[in-house]
Amino acid sequence: MSQKNPEYAADHDHTREEMQNLQVAPASSDVEEPCSSSHLMASSLKGHTSEETQVPEDMEEPCSSSQLLTASNQEDPAYETPSTSRGLQHPYVSSSESAKGLGNKEMQGNSVIPPDQPDLPVMTIDGKVNFLVNYMLYKYQVKEMMSMNDIMTLIVREDEHHFHEILMRASERMEMVFGLEVREVDPVNHFYALFIKLGLTYDGMRADEYSFPKTGLLILILGVVFMKGNRATEEEIWEVLNPMGIYAGMNHFIFGDPRELLTDDFVREQYLAYQPIANSDPIQYEYVWGPRAKAETSKMKVLEFVAKVHGSDPTVFPSQYEEALIEEEERTLAMILEQAGPSSASGESSSDMGSNVPHI
């Protein structure tokens, strides 16, 4: 049976409220939406409110054949530094069109606006966070790094003093929703790249369809299983997912069919194992961590992620924290023994041989 955890139960409502904030905001009616994903994840994480996104005309581009998120799965992407000779790449247009299109629109933006023409709508800070999330997803798809200069020019623009706030909020969403970590890989030239979190090597993206990374949902489910005593029924998992707007049999705009992910993909990829509950009558089934999850990540890493979702520290879950510490110690000891194995075995063998030599 699943283990009850009072600390987890006490904070569960807080987790629901925070995850419910991760929704899509409608576009302002007076602004043409260039792509259905352009207002993705408009609400911020805890502490921020959602605002309508308004996109200035000189930022609007129709989705092209190279639109967001059509690439295949990648584990540790070999990022490329964008060539400056190609010009700045807009996330909604092909590379061959971007420099020309942006250049023409910048020139148009410098023209004098007649006095009777209203000012162009200005993108809010929330809107720029949304735009940056989409830009990050695009860069992850094409395996390219992002430069501070590109982010400033394409997205932040006149709000230079808000750069770090916009980057931090977008990075938090990438982490909590998509399971991707933003790292500054070149501190001198300020280039950033995206990596799958917690040591995992799966993002669930498919080459033949419009797709988003699924790692965030995988980490969340691994967390539910761990917090429930290292085993959870499907009903217990849906009890956590439903308040977040994720339902069995209902297509989700990020995760697709979540039940298919849970019962097929995550099990097939060996991140989860589906097994009968001992002594259950009628027979019932539960999920546990699969061999790939045990090999790639750890209970401590997952607990730290769960604690961050709660806005707390791993120590507020004492039983899970102690269990995670024990696992860390066991892994460290196993690593030491493995590294010292051959010499240790050799020494033991020599000692045994010496003890069998008859004394004269």
From Swiss-Prot:
Record's keyword annotation contains Chloroplast: no
Biased composition range(s): Polar residues: 63-98
Alphabetical list of Pfam families matching this protein: MAGE
Database matches in Gene3D superfamilies: MAGE homology domain, winged helix WH1 motif, MAGE homology domain, winged helix WH2 motif
Domain MAGE: residue ranges: 125-324
Protein name according to UniProt: Melanoma-associated antigen B16
Organism: Rattus norvegicus (Rat)
Presence of the UniProt keyword Calcium in the record: no
Gene Ontology annotations for the cellular component aspect, listed alphabetically: nucleus
UniProt keywords, alphabetically: Tumor antigen
Low complexity: compositionally biased ranges: 341-360
Residue ranges with Basic and acidic residues bias: 9-19
Domain of life, source organism: Eukaryota
Biological process per Gene Ontology, one example term: negative regulation of transcription by RNA polymerase II
Residue span of region Disordered: 1-118, 340-360
